[in-house]
């Protein structure tokens, strides 16, 4: 992939991802937070599965497995909490559709590792923003506690994603 193509690819991807930033304002409501956080978790899991399949670097694959493990666990806790608190949660198909809309069309080979690393930085920055916004202005104390407890792991993921980006990704 040429530099121009890569920049165009990431510009389009960023435009798509920033479109979801408008939804963050809705995150103050518990149901909306549950849906957005779940969809972002599913997107993390699905892109990580792609990285295990298409990635070429061992560090990318190790990071991807960690994303699958950690985000599966977080989504399970979130679903359990939503059920306990009688919060409405979109069905799995709707959440998967939201997640798919967040997933970049990642490329094969070396460029896949680059695209995945760059995607993970942006995705984790947005997820951290969603969780921080809920901690600061959310309406459900239990969800606020979940968000607060999950933030350190998300921040750790962002740090690791930035390390991957330094090794494999495009730096702007």
Feature map (PLM): residue ranges:
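His/Met- and acidic-residue-enriched segments that coordinate or traffic transition-metal cofactors
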Residues: 2-172
């Amino acid at each position: 992939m040429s530099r121009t193509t890569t920049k165009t690819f990431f510009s389009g991807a960023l435009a798509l991802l920033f479109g979801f930033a408008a939804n963050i304002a809705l995150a103050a409501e518990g149901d909306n937070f549950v849906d957005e956080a779940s969809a972002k978790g599913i997107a993390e899991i699905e892109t990580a599965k792609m990285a295990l399949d298409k990635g070429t670097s061992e560090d990318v694959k190790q990071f991807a497995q960690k994303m699958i493990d950690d985000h599966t666990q977080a989504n399970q806790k979130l679903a359990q909490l939503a059920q306990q608190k009688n919060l409405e949660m979109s069905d799995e198909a709707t959440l998967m559709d939201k997640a798919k809309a967040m997933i970049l069309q990642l490329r094969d080979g070396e460029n896949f590792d680059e695209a995945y690393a760059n995607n993970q930085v942006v995705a984790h920055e947005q997820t951290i923003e969603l969780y921080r916004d809920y901690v600061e202005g959310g309406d459900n104390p239990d969800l606020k506690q979940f968000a607060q407890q999950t933030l350190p792991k998300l921040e750790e993921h962002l740090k690791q994603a930035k390390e991957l980006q330094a090794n494999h990704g495009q730096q702007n």
